[in-house]
From Swiss-Prot:
The lineage of its organism: Eukaryota, Metazoa, Chordata, Craniata, Vertebrata. It comes from Rattus norvegicus (Rat). Residues 115-158, 557-581 are annotated as: Disordered. Residues 160-219 form the SH3 domain. Its main location: other. This is Rho guanine nucleotide exchange factor 6. The modification Phosphothreonine is found at T133. Residues 1-111 form the Calponin-homology (CH) domain.
Length: 772
């Protein structure tokens, strides 16, 4: 590592120089531009020697300001007895090597001072160095348990001794506490457990991943860690500033809790007794502000108790993690209500401003109330910054270090959830308060409260085109809206009733992440793609809760009293229900199972006797008449039909007529017996056993007769109706386009006629003037 890179790493590790977002191609030029104004140097000397620089220009605008900052740094370096450079050497960049030599000397001088104190990390580094120089001292073999313990021990050390692994395969999380990784990702392991699962951090997120999906990175392959560079150890400085940062957290937390309590006592509670707002409006304005105040006071007390223990036993991160469920419930509820509170502030701004100023607030009083109600959001953002600063000044071996990292991640996640929830509730309020274009039916406010709302991408029916929609879920209906072309409002696109809705997850199919479909008897198939997994899980939970609610209980009974008793007995039992099963329909016993196949057409059964008598009468005249009245049978009986056609003798037809008479008598007797039991046993229609003859004409003009069940026929008719609807929709679109084109053409013709008329008039007037 060259001197420039060493200095850059050192400054970043001390926190006085911001880490560049991109890879540094030329460290020397980067240093020149970063150190030129002297601000970084003043921060450095203040960090190394607190109190050496009392005041410096943090935003220098002129050359004189920059030179003054550099001189302040050089004065501080005089106490370290190192060779210094001239201010112009740095500002002009002409002799930058002297600047590097001074910085390296400062690093060496502070290292010598720090080396006089014991440091666990330095001893671990020296032990590692000695083991590398003497490989014979290494243990030749270890058991898997010992290796796991060694890896866990490595993670308690600092710098390059932290276990770092590289993903060999892609892994997709299936639970909330797991970590999704891609091949080649670098993961910092935070916990090693037996059983094949390790805990690690990737891109600021901590979770579990399978250990056989990764491989350990060799020391030569590991990325450079600023804390791991020998000679840049700042443990005593870290220890000194840890207490300062912790005290800052306590002070700001007390001040924040005090401000909330002051707002509640001085303004909000007196406002409740005032007549400026109704009870509903005041409830919207206040929300759960009182609960937030109480919770923040509890948090202050808990943090103070943590700070009273010895420094190596501080559990600030653990305390915050224990209270994180309360954080989420309090702040998410506050965020959900905040857009309604802002709406109340907007509607009654004049009255509230007068009230605030009468209570002693400075003008404009409404601004004090608005900013005070927004402080919980600003404080939530500060938690992340404060904890990051605390972690920066905390030793990696501190028992609270891992909890601090987890708390940072938890607060980042909570902050993102709160921001999304505020935007969603604000959009929801906008939809409910503004008119919706092409809305059908009663006002949307009559549907009740919105259970959930989000922006999705949907596919309707068999169409592959994806459309952006806003879904609003109410207790009885799902509303679909779209943004207007100019993004000035919302347009109504349809609704789906909850009754009869069937929701199916599609996320298990590859390529359909965060996807589900909606089907039903009254709606065409809708495929919905959610923007993230959180929205997807929320939609699944809410829709399943509404569609799979308590089922109604009914049973066939002869009297209404038995039906009522059955219903009451069902509702009184609180036992858990099993899986839904189709109703058990008791089929009545009948002689119809011994009958031959019923008539293939319903119309044939109506005039059966008349037709049979007519057939018998005409059969003696011509065999063609018999063939005319007999319907075509099933395909597998084609041979018998051909044989029947061949038989043309009158004797054979008479024999068949006698057989038909026997069948008729049998059916008549069976129907009579069945009729005697009609009052006692209900008749049940079984669609799958009903048959129909369907005549279809193909494109080549050939007519085909097919036998279909009633169910198949209904579904075929449903498909035909669907096709007709689509064709009708296309025809409407074509008609609208044609009407629009005709109107445009009419406008164009009128315009041309008008221009022609004007030109003719102009010519005639010019001719008249010439003649005169």
């Amino acid at each position: 590592m060259n001197p420039e890179e060493r200095v850059v790493t050192w400054l970043i590790s001390l926190g006085v120089l911001e880490s560049p977002k991109k890879t540094i191609c030329d460290p020397e030029e980067f240093l020149k531009s970063s150190l030129k104004n002297g601000v970084v140097l003043c921060k450095l000397i203040s960090r190394l020697l607190p109190g050496s620089v009392e005041k410096y220009c943090q935003e220098p605008q002129t050359e004189a300001d920059c030179i003054d900052n550099i001189n302040d740094f050089l004065k501080g370096c005089a106490t370290l007895q190192v060779e210094v450079f001239e201010p112009d050497d740095l500002y002009s960049g002409a002799n930058f090597s002297k600047v590097l030599n001074t910085l390296l000397a400062v690093n060496k001088a502070t290292e010598d001072q720090l080396s006089e104190r014991p440091c666990g990390r330095s001893s671990s580094l020296s032990a590692t160095t000695s083991s590398q120089t003497n490989p014979q001292a290494a243990v030749p073999s270890t058991t898997p348990e010992q290796q796991s313990e060694e890896k866990a021990a490595e993670m308690t050390e600092n710098g390059s001794h932290q276990l770092i692994v590289k993903a060999r395969f892609n892994f997709k999380q299936t639970n909330e506490d797991e970590l999704s990784v891609c091949k080649g990702d670098i993961i910092y392991v935070t916990r090693v457990e037996e059983g094949g699962w390790w805990e690690g951090t990737l891109n600021g997120r901590t979770g579990w991943f399978p250990s056989n999906y990764v491989r350990e990175i060799k020391p030569s392959e590991r990325p450079l860690s600023p804390k791991a560079v020998k000679g840049f150890d700042t443990a005593p400085l870290t220890k000194n500033y840890y207490t300062v940062v912790l005290q800052n957290i306590l002070d700001t937390e007390k001040e924040y809790a005090k401000e909330l309590q002051s707002l509640l006592v001085t303004y909000l509670r007196p406002l409740q007794s005032n007549n400026n707002l109704s009870t509903v409006e005041f409830t919207c304005l206040l929300g759960n502000f009182e609960e937030v105040c109480t919770f923040q006071q509890t948090l202050c007390q808990a943090l103070e108790e943590c700070s009273k223990s010895p420094e190596n036993q501080h559990k600030v991160g653990g305390c915050l993690l224990n209270l994180m469920p309360h954080f989420k419930s309090m702040y998410l509820a506050y965020c959900a209500n905040h857009p309604s509170a802002v709406n109340v502030l907007t509607q009654h701004s004049d009255d509230l401003e007068r009230f605030m100023e009468n209570q002693g607030a400075s003008s404009p009083g409404i601004l004090i109330l608005t900013t005070s109600l927004s402080k919980p959001f600003m404080r939530l953002e500060k938690y992340v910054t404060l904890l990051q600063e605390l972690e920066r000044h905390m030793e990696d071996t501190h028992p609270d270090h891992q909890d601090i990292l987890k708390a940072i991640i938890a607060f980042k996640s909570l902050m993102g959830q709160c921001q999304d929830l505020r935007k969603r509730k604000q959009l929801e309020l906008q939809i409910l308060s503004e008119p919706i274009q092409a809305w059908e039916g009663d006002d949307i406010k009559t549907l009740g409260n919105v259970i959930f709302m989000s922006q999705v991408v949907m596919q309707h029916g068999a169409c592959e085109e994806k459309e952006e929609r806003y879904f609003l879920l109410f207790s009885s209906v799902l509303i679909m809206l779209s943004a207007s072309p100019r993004m000035s409002g919302f347009m109504y696109q349809g609704k789906v009733p909850i009754a009869g809705m069937v929701v199916t997850r599609l996320d298990e199919i590859e390529g359909n992440d965060c996807t589900f479909e909606i089907t039903g008897s009254t709606v065409e198939r809708i495929v919905v793609h959610c923007n993230n997994n959180q929205d997807f899980q929320e939609w699944m939970e809410q829709l399943n809760r509404l569609t799979k609610g308590p089922a109604s209980c009914s049973s066939l009974s002869k009297t209404s009293s038995s039906s009522c008793s059955t219903h009451s007995s069902f509702s009184s039992t609180g036992q858990p229900r099993g899986p839904l099963e189709p109703p058990q329909i008791i089929k009545p016993w009948s002689l119809s199972c011994l009958r031959p196949a019923p008539p293939l057409r319903p119309s044939a059964a109506l005039g059966y006797k008349e037709r049979m008598s007519y057939i018998l009468k005409e059969s003696s005249k011509s065999p063609k008449t018999m063939k005319k009245f007999l319907h075509k049978r099933k395909t597998e009986r084609k041979t018998s039909e051909e044989e029947y056609v061949i038989r043309k003798s009158t004797a054979a037809l008479e024999e068949d007529a006698q057989i038909l008479k026997v069948i008729e008598a049998y059916c008549t007797s069976a129907s009579f017996q069945q009729g005697t039991r009609k009052d006692s046993v209900p008749q049940v229609l079984l669609p799958e056993e009903e048959k129909l003859i369907i005549e279809e004409t193909r494109s080549n003009g050939q007519t085909i007769i097919e036998e279909k069940s009633l169910v198949d026929t209904v579904y075929a008719l449903k498909d035909e109706v669907k096709e007709l609807k689509q064709e009708n929709k296309k025809m409407k679109q074509c008609l609208e386009e044609e009407l629009k084109s005709r109107k445009d053409l009419e406008k164009l013709v009128r315009k041309l006629l008008k221009q022609t008329d004007e030109s003719i008039r102009a010519e005639s007037s010019s001719k008249t003037s010439i003649l005169q």
